[in-house]
C-alpha cells in the first residue's frame, strides 16, 4: 500500500523527480526527530523567499499570519469543491493506515421537558403592582405557603436517534420546542426546567460524560464581545476548546506511517499537524473556519454592537457558528444558524456541514426556519416537530410519502420544507388535502404523531432504541470525560491575554477616567489649598473633610467597573455554560490586571494633592497615604465588580451599587462619629472599607509632630480632632486599616468568583402565564384557533385590497449615479490599504415605482442595507454622491420622512408596551390628523389581523433574546408598526429574516396587499423560497462593492432574470425545480467571476437592459405636468400637543411596567431613609455643639447625595434603551425632540414625588426634626427638586454621550463636584473665591441650604460652637452661609436647576445622534 501511494503521490503531487527526492530527504529528516518535535514539524512552501521554490521544514506552531493565510488559500481556493477535496484527502490518509474518525450516536427515549409557570389573573404584564404581588408571593413561598403555579409541557414523550455520518434537519413552527430539544440533547438545558427521560451518547448517559465538551450547542442568539475582532473571537474559542482527539489521532497516524514507510501529502500533513497542537494563541483552524464560512473578508474587523460599527448581522450569525465549529467536537446541535444569510451563503454553509458529516462521520443536527429547496435537499434525515411532539423522524426521501399516506400532497412548485411546516398548521392544512372528493377535517398533531409511530419507520426507531448500544464499539476518543479541554493554567493564560486585549481596546475609558481624576484632584487641591489651611481645630476639620473626600473620589472611580462587567456577563455565561473555562480563570485576570490601574490612579491623586493641600511634608507619611488610597481604589473596583456579578443586570446592579455606596458613606464615621452611632449598629463601621481608610488616613496625618500642640484640655490638637470624629486610635491602627482593606479586596474578589461560579445567567427568569392561556393549553386549545383564511401555496393578494387603503399619494423614487464612501477603518489601514476612503456603493442608478414590489438582493456585504439607508436618509456618517428624486423633485429629508416607512433589520421597540399599543402609538403619531380616531383604531385592528398579530396583541414586546416576543413575532411587529403609518414608500430591510416559512408567507402576503394599493415597496431579502421570491415584481441585484449587476422585471416564474443571466456565455443553466434566487446568487458569485474571467457589473452596464433603465430613470426624474413638490404645513403629522400627549401615554405605560427601574428606586429610597433614621435616631433636636449640628447635616447630606446618585445611575441604563427606540422613531418623523423630551421629563415627576414623600414620611419622625407644616413642605420641596436634578442629569448625560459606559464615567465627575461643593465638606465661606462660583451652580448646595435654612434657620437655641456660644441660626449664617430670610430666593434658584437640565436634554437630543449607520 505504501509503494503504490508513493508512486501515485509522485505522479500527482510532485513536479519532477528532483523535487520528490528533496522532499523525501526532508521527510526523512523529520522522521528522525523525537516524537514531540516530529508531531510539530512538517513541510511547507517557501513563501516570500525570493524566486526560490520548493519546501522547507518548519515548526507548525510558529507559522506566521501570512504563512497560515497562504497555506489555507492553497488548500481551499473554491470553497465548495476544495473543502470536499481537503476532507477526502484527510480521510484517505487515515484510512490508509487503518485509523478511523471518532463518531457519536445520540439517543433520546421518552424525553419530556416541563416549565413551572406562575399563573396570574388578567394580562401577564410585569406592572409595579404585579411585581409587588410577586415579592409577597415569594415571601409566602419561603414560609411554606403554596402559590398558584402550573407545569407547562414543552416536550412530550419524544424519542429518536441522531446518527453519525448523517445530516439531520429539525423543522417545526416557532414555539414547538425545537430549541429546547437541541439544548436538552447537548446538555445545555436551563436548570429551572424539569427534564425526564433518557439521553445517551454512544450508550453513555449524560451524567457519565461531559456533554458540553462532547457536543457543541450553537445558539440562535449572537452574543459576542463587541471590542474583539472576528479572528480574535474565533482564536479565543479555538484556544479554549482545545484540539480534542486530533492530537491522539495525529500521533497514531504518524506512528503508523513511520512504521509503514509512507510519505504523506505535505500540505495535508502540515494542516493536520497545525490543527492538532493545543493552546496556540493563533490557530490554523481559525483561518480554515474563516475561509469556509466566508468570514475571511471581515477577519480583522471589530464585531461591534448596536452603537459601535462592526460586522454585519449576517456575519455575526456566521461568527456564532464559527465560534463553536472551530472546536473538535463530533456532535453539533445548531439552532437557526442561517437567519439573516442570503440563500447562496446559507447553501454553502449547509454544504460544508454535509461534507463534514459524511466524510468525518460527525453527528450534525440543524434547526432551520426557511431552508431553500436546494439546502433542504442536502439533508439526509428530517425531524418534524409540532406542539412539543415529533410528527416525523426519518429519511428525507420518505417524508412526502408519509404525508401522502395521511392524505396530504405537496404542490408542484412548493418547497418541501415550507409544505412540512404548513401542513401541520390548522389554518393551512386544508389546502394540501389530497382527496378532493372527500371533505377535509383537521388531522391533529397527536393523530399524525401516533400514525408515524405505527408506520415501519417509527417501529424501526423503537426497535433500535430497545436494543442497548454496544459500548465496545465506541472510539476511545469519541467522548469527553474532562470538563475542560486544556490544563487550567493554560485557560487562565488565555483569559488573561483576552482581558489585557480588552483593556487596550477600551483605553479611552481608562484615559477618560484618569483625566477625570486629574480634574477632580485639581479642583480639590485648589479648594483646600495650603495657603488657606492653618494648623488649628477649625482647619483640622477641613483637613479631615479633604481626607474623606479623597476616599470617596477613589471609591466612585470604581463605578465604571460595574457597567463594564455587566456588559460582558452574557458572553461569560454563554462560554461558562459551554465549559470554555472555569469562573476563576475569568475572574482573576479581571482582578489582577486592574492592580497597575489602581496603582497609577492613586499615585496620580496623591502626587497632585498631597503637598498642594499641605498635608504633613514627610516622605514617609506621603508613602503611607498613597498605600491607603491604592488599597481604597483596588477595594472599590473589586466591590463594584462583585456587585455586578451578583445582580447581573444593569439597572439592578446600578441600584445595588448606589445602595452600597450609601451604606459605606453613612457607616464611615464621618457623617456621624462612631461614638454617636447606636450600639447595635456599630458593627457597620467595622465592615466598611471607607471606615478603615478614614482611620488609616487620619491617624497618618493627625499623629504627625506638627499636630502635637497641647490644648487647654491637656490633649494634643491632633488627638482633639480625632476624638471629635470618634477616630482616636494609635498609630498601629494604620497597619490594621491597610491589612483590613486588602483583606476586604480578597473577600470581594472571592465573592465575585463564587457568584460567577454558582449563579445562573440573568436571562433565566421565572415565566408567567395568564389563567386564560393556561386553560387554552390544558383543554380548549383547538377551540381557541380562529378561523383565519388559510395561506395559499403561493403569495396572493387579498381579495379586497381596497380595505387597506387610506388617503395617500403614490410616489416614485429615482436615483442616479449614487456613490457612498466611508473613511477607511483603522484595521484596514494596518493591513496596507492606502486609500483614504472605502467605497461601499458604486454608480447605482435605478427607480422604484408605485404598485411595484421590488426585491433588493445580493450576497452578504453587497451593500443592500447601505443602499436602503442612503435612499431613506438614515446614514449618519460617510459621504454620499449622486442624485435622489421623489416623483421628479429633489428629495428633501424632512418631507420624505413623512411619506416613507422603514422596517429595520434589528427590530427595535419599546420593551414595556404591548403589541397593540405599539401600533396605536405609531398610528396616532404618523397618520394625518384628518383621519378620525375611530378610523385609526379600525386601521390598527386591520393591520393586526393582516399580519396575524391579533392573538398576541396584549403580549409585552420585551427585550430581544431575553423576554417578551419571539424573533419572528418581533419581525412581524416591525412590519406592522410601519404599515400602520400608511406610507407611500416603504423600505424593508430583511422583513422575513428570522421567520419560519409560514410567518414569512404571512408577512409577504401583507406586503403584497399593500403594494397592490399603489405604494412603492422595496425589500432586501436573503433566503426567499421560490414562492416568496416570485411574489416580487422587480429585482435589483448587487455584487460585493455595491455594484449593480441586474435591475429589471422578474417575469413569470422568474423567466426574465433567468433569461438575462443564461444569455451570458459560460453561465450554468438553471436546473429543474431549482430556486431561481439561489441559482442567481450562485452563478454571479466572485468565484464564478474569477473562473469565467468576467465582471457581471460591467456586463450589465453595457447591456440593453441598462440603457432602457437609464432612459426610464431620466423619464421618471422629470415631474409630471402640473404636479408640485411634496409640501406639508408642518414637519410632523401631528401638532406639538398631540405629539406630547402620545409620547406621554407611551412613557407612562412603560414606566408602570418597568419595576426593575421604578420599584428598585422607590424601594432604595425607603430602605436608605429607614437606615439613616435608625442610625441618626432622634438626633434632630439634640443640638448642643457644632458637632451635633454637623451630624444632622451629615444625615441629610448623605441622603440628598446618595439617593440622588442612585436615581441617576439606575436611570442611565433605562434611558439608553429608550434612546435606541427614539432614534428609530425620530428617523420616521414621528415627533419633535422637544415633545419627546418633555414627555420623558413629565413622566418622571410622579415617581420622584413618591420618593420625596417617602423620604419625608420616614426621616421626619425617626430623626426627630421640627414638624411644622412649613418645615415639612420645604423639606419635601427640597428633596423633590434634588431628585429631579439627578434624574434629569441622567437624561442629559445620555443625550451627550455615545453609550452607557461613557455616560457612567462622566456621571462620576458630576458626583464629585456635587459632593465637594455641596457645602458640607467645606462650607461656602471657606471656599476660595476662585471656586465659590461653583458652589452657586451646584444643585446639592441649594438643596442643603433650603433644607437647613427652613429647618434650623429660625431656631435660636444656644450651642457651643468651636469654644464659642452662639445660637443655631447665627452659627448657620456665619459658618455655612445659610439665611432663613432668603428661603423663597433659594427655592426659586433650586427649581431652576431641573428646568435647565431638562432644557439641555431636549436641546442635545435634537442636535446629537450617536447611532453610526
From Swiss-Prot:
GO terms for molecular function: ABC-type transporter activity; ATP binding; ATP hydrolysis activity. Induction: Induced by 2,4-D, but repressed by cycloheximide (CHX). PROSITE patterns: ABC_TRANSPORTER_2. Residues 140-412, 813-1065 form the ABC transporter domain. GO terms for cellular component: plasma membrane. Belongs to the ABC transporter superfamily. ABCG family. PDR (TC 3.A.1.205) subfamily. This is ABC transporter G family member 33. May be a general defense protein. The chain crosses the membrane at residues 509-529, 546-566, 580-600, 626-646, 652-672, 738-758, 1157-1177, 1189-1209, 1245-1265, 1276-1296, 1302-1322, 1330-1350, 1385-1405. Residues 490-702, 1138-1352 form the ABC transmembrane type-2 domain. Residues 11-21 have a biased composition (Basic and acidic residues). Residues 1-21 are annotated as: Disordered. InterPro entries: AAA+_ATPase (IPR003593), ABC2_TM (IPR013525), ABC_transporter-like_ATP-bd (IPR003439), ABCG_dom (IPR043926), ABCG_PDR_1 (IPR034001), ABCG_PDR_2 (IPR034003), P-loop_NTPase (IPR027417), PDR_assoc (IPR013581). ATP 1 binds at residues 172-179. SMART domains: AAA. Expressed in roots and stems. Gene3D superfamilies: P-loop containing nucleotide triphosphate hydrolases. It is a multi-pass membrane protein. Residues 1-10 have a biased composition (Low complexity). It is found in: Membrane. The keyword Transmembrane applies. ATP 2 binds at residues 858-865.
Amino acid at each position: 500500500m505504501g509503494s503504490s501511494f508513493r508512486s501515485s503521490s509522485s505522479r500527482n503531487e510532485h513536479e519532477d523527480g528532483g523535487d520528490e527526492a528533496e522532499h523525501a530527504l526532508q521527510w526523512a529528516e523529520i522522521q528522525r526527530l523525537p516524537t514531540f518535535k516530529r508531531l510539530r514539524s512538517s513541510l511547507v512552501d517557501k513563501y516570500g523567499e525570493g524566486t526560490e521554490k520548493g519546501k522547507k521544514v518548519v515548526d507548525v506552531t510558529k507559522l506566521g499570519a501570512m504563512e497560515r493565510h497562504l497555506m489555507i488559500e492553497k488548500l481551499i481556493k473554491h470553497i465548495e469543491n476544495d473543502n470536499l477535496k481537503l476532507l477526502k484527502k484527510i480521510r484517505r490518509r487515515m484510512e490508509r493506515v487503518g485509523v478511523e474518525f471518532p463518531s457519536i450516536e445520540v439517543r433520546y427515549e421518552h424525553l419530556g421537558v416541563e416549565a413551572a409557570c406562575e399563573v396570574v389573573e388578567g394580562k401577564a404584564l410585569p406592572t409595579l403592582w404585579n411585581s409587588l404581588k410577586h415579592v409577597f408571593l415569594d415571601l409566602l413561598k419561603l414560609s411554606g405557603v403554596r402559590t398558584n403555579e402550573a407545569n407547562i409541557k414543552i416536550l412530550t414523550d419524544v424519542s429518536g436517534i441522531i446518527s453519525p455520518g448523517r445530516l439531520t434537519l429539525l423543522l417545526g413552527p416557532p414555539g414547538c420546542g425545537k430549541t429546547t430539544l437541541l439544548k436538552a440533547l447537548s446538555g445545555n438545558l436551563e436548570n429551572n426546567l424539569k427534564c425526564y427521560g433518557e439521553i445517551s451518547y454512544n450508550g453513555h448517559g449524560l451524567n457519565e460524560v461531559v456533554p458540553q465538551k462532547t457536543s457543541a450547542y450553537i445558539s440562535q442568539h449572537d452574543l459576542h464581545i463587541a471590542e474583539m475582532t472576528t479572528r480574535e473571537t474565533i482564536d479565543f474559542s479555538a484556544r479554549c476548546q482545545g484540539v480534542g482527539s486530533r492530537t491522539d489521532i495525529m500521533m497514531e497516524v504518524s506512528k503508523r506511517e513511520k512504521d509503514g514507510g509512507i510519505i504523506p501529502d505535505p500540505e495535508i500533513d502540515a494542516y493536520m499537524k497545525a490543527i492538532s497542537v493545543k493552546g496556540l494563541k493563533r490557530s490554523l483552524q481559525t483561518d480554515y473556519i474563516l475561509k469556509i464560512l466566508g468570514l475571511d473578508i471581515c477577519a480583522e474587523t471589530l464585531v461591534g454592537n448596536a452603537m459601535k460599527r462592526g460586522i454585519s448581522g449576517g456575519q455575526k450569525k456566521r461568527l456564532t457558528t464559527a465560534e463553536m465549529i472551530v472546536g473538535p467536537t463530533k456532535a453539533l446541535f445548531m439552532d437557526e444558524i442561517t437567519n439573516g444569510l442570503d440563500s447562496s451563503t446559507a447553501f454553502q454553509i449547509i454544504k460544508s456541514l454535509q461534507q463534514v458529516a459524511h466524510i468525518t462521520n460527525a453527528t450534525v443536527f440543524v434547526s432551520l426556519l426557511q431552508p431553500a429547496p436546494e439546502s433542504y435537499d442536502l439533508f439526509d434525515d428530517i425531524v418534524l416537530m409540532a406542539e412539543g411532539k415529533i410528527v416525523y423522524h426519518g429519511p428525507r426521501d420518505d417524508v412526502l410519502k408519509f404525508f401522502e399516506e395521511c392524505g396530504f400532497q405537496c404542490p408542484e412548485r412548493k418547497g418541501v420544507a415550507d409544505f412540512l411546516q404548513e401542513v401541520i398548521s390548522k389554518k393551512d392544512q386544508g389546502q394540501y388535502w389530497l382527496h378532493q372528493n372527500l371533505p377535509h377535517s383537521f388531522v391533529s398533531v397527536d393523530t399524525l404523531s401516533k400514525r408515524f409511530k405505527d408506520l415501519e419507520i417509527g417501529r424501526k426507531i423503537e426497535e433500535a432504541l430497545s436494543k442497548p448500544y454496544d459500548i465496545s464499539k465506541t472510539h476511545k476518543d469519541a467522548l469527553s470525560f474532562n470538563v475542560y479541554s486544556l490544563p487550567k493554567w493554560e485557560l487562565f493564560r488565555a483569559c488573561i491575554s483576552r482581558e489585557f486585549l480588552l483593556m487596550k481596546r477600551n483605553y479611552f475609558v481608562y484615559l477618560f477616567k484618569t483625566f477625570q481624576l486629574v480634574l477632580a484632584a485639581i479642583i480639590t487641591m485648589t479648594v483646600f489649598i495650603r495657603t488657606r489651611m492653618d494648623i488649628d481645630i477649625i482647619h483640622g476639620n477641613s483637613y479631615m473633610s479633604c481626607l474623606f473626600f479623597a476616599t470617596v473620589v477613589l471609591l466612585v472611580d470604581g463605578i465604571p467597573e460595574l457597567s463594564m462587567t455587566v456588559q460582558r456577563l452574557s458572553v461569560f455565561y454563554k462560554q461558562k455554560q459551554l465549559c470554555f473555562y472555569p469562573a476563576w480563570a475569568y475572574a482573576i485576570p479581571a482582578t489582577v490586571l486592574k492592580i497597575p490601574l489602581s496603582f497609577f490612579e492613586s499615585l496620580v491623586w496623591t502626587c497632585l494633592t498631597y503637598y498642594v493641600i499641605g498635608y504633613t511634608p514627610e516622605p514617609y507619611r506621603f508613602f503611607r497615604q498613597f498605600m491607603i488610597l491604592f488599597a481604597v481604589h483596588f477595594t472599590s473596583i473589586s466591590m463594584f465588580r462583585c456587585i455586578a456579578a451578583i445582580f447581573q443586570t444593569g439597572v439592578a446592579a446600578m441600584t445595588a451599587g448606589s445602595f452600597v455606596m450609601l451604606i459605606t458613606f453613612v457607616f464611615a464615621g464621618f457623617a456621624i462619629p462612631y461614638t454617636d452611632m447606636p450600639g447595635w449598629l456599630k458593627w457597620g463601621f467595622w465592615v466598611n472599607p471607607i471606615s478603615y481608610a478614614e482611620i488609616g488616613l487620619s491617624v497618618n496625618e493627625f499623629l504627625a509632630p506638627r499636630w502635637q500642640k497641647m490644648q487647654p484640655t491637656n490633649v494634643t490638637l491632633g488627638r482633639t480632632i480625632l476624638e471629635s470624629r470618634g477616630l482616636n486610635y494609635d498609630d498601629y491602627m494604620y497597619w490594621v486599616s491597610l491589612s483590613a482593606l486588602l483583606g476586604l479586596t480578597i473577600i470581594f474578589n472571592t465573592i465575585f468568583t463564587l457568584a460567577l461560579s454558582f449563579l445562573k445567567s440573568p436571562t433565566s427568569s421565572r415565566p408567567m402565564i395568564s389563567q386564560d392561556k393556561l386553560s387554552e393549553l390544558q383543554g380548549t386549545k383547538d377551540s381557541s384557533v380562529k378561523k383565519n383564511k388559510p395561506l395559499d401555496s403561493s403569495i396572493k393578494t387579498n381579495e379586497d385590497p381596497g380595505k387597506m387603503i387610506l388617503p395617500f399619494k403614490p410616489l416614485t423614487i429615482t436615483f442616479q449615479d449614487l456613490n457612498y464612501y466611508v473613511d477607511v477603518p483603522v484595521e484596514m489601514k494596518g493591513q496596507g490599504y492606502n486609500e483614504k476612503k472605502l467605497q461601499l456603493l458604486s454608480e447605482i442608478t435605478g427607480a422604484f415605482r408605485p404598485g411595484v414590489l421590488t426585491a433588493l438582493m445580493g450576497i452578504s456585504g453587497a451593500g443592500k442595507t447601505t443602499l436602503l439607508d442612503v435612499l431613506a436618509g438614515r446614514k449618519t456618517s460617510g459621504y454620499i454622491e449622486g442624485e435622489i428624486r421623489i416623483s421628479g423633485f429633489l428629495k428633501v429629508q424632512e418631507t420624505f420622512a413623512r411619506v416613507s416607512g422603514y422596517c429595520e433589520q434589528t427590530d427595535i421597540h419599546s420593551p414595556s408596551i404591548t403589541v397593540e399599543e405599539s401600533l396605536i402609538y405609531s398610528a396616532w403619531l404618523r397618520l394625518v390628523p384628518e383621519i378620525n380616531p375611530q378610523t385609526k383604531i379600525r386601521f390598527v385592528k386591520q393591520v393586526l389581523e393582516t399580519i396575524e398579530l391579533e392573538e398576541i396583541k396584549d403580549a409585552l414586546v420585551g427585550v430581544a433574546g431575553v423576554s417578551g416576543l419571539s424573533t419572528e413575532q418581533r419581525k412581524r411587529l416591525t412590519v406592522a408598526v410601519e404599515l400602520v403609518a400608511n406610507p407611500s414608500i416603504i423600505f424593508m430591510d430583511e422583513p422575513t429574516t428570522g421567520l419560519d416559512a409560514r410567518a414569512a408567507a404571512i408577512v409577504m402576503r401583507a406586503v403584497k396587499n399593500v403594494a397592490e394599493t399603489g405604494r412603492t415597496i422595496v425589500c432586501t431579502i436573503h433566503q426567499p423560497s421560490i414562492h416568496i421570491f416570485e411574489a416580487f415584481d422587480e429585482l435589483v441585484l448587487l455584487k460585493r462593492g455595491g455594484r449593480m449587476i441586474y435591475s429589471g422585471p422578474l417575469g413569470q416564474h422568474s423567466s426574465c432574470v433567468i433569461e438575462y443571466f443564461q444569455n451570458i456565455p459560460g453561465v450554468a443553466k438553471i436546473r429543474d425545480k431549482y430556486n431561481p434566487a439561489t441559482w442567481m446568487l450562485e452563478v454571479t458569485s466572485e468565484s464564478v467571476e474569477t473562473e469565467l474571467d468576467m465582471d457581471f457589473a460591467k456586463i450589465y452596464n453595457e447591456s440593453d437592459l441598462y440603457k432602457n433603465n437609464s432612459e426610464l430613470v431620466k423619464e421618471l426624474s422629470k415631474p409630471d405636468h402640473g404636479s408640485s413638490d411634496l409640501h406639508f404645513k408642518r414637519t410632523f403629522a401631528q401638532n406639538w400637543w398631540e405629539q406630547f400627549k402620545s409620547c406621554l401615554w407611551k412613557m407612562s405605560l412603560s414606566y408602570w411596567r418597568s419595576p426593575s427601574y421604578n420599584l428598585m428606586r422607590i424601594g432604595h429610597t425607603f430602605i436608605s431613609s429607614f437606615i439613616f433614621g435608625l442610625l441618626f435616631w432622634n438626633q434632630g433636636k439634640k443640638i448642643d455643639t457644632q458637632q451635633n449640628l454637623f451630624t444632622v447635616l451629615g444625615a441629610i447630606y448623605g441622603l440628598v447625595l446618595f439617593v440622588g446618585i442612585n436615581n441617576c445611575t439606575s436611570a442611565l441604563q433605562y434611558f439608553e434603551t429608550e434612546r435606541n427606540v427614539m432614534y428609530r422613531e425620530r428617523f420616521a418623523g414621528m415627533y419633535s425632540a422637544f415633545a419627546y423630551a418633555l414627555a420623558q421629563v413629565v413622566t418622571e415627576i410622579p415617581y420622584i414625588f413618591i420618593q420625596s414623600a417617602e423620604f419625608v414620611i420616614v426621616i421626619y419622625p425617626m430623626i426627630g426634626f421640627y414638624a411644622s407644616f412649613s418645615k415639612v413642605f420645604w423639606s419635601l420641596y427640597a428633596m423633590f427638586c434634588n431628585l429631579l436634578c439627578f434624574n434629569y442629569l441622567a437624561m442629559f448625560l445620555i443625550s451627550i454621550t455615545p453609550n452607557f459606559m461613557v455616560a457612567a464615567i462622566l456621571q462620576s465627575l458630576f458626583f464629585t463636584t456635587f459632593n465637594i461643593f455641596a457645602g458640607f465638606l467645606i462650607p461656602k465661606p471657606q471656599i476660595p473665591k476662585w471656586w465659590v462660583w461653583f458652589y452657586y451652580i451646584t444643585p446639592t448646595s441649594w438643596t442643603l441650604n433650603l433644607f437647613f435654612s427652613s429647618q434650623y434657620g429660625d431656631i435660636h437655641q444656644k450651642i457651643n460652637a468651636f469654644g464659642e456660644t452662639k445660637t443655631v441660626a447665627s452659627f448657620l449664617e456665619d459658618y455655612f452661609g445659610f439665611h432663613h430670610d432668603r428661603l423663597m430666593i433659594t427655592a426659586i434658584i433650586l427649581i431652576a436647576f431641573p428646568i435647565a437640565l431638562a432644557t439641555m436634554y431636549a436641546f442635545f437630543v435634537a442636535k446629537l445622534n450617536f447611532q453610526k449607520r
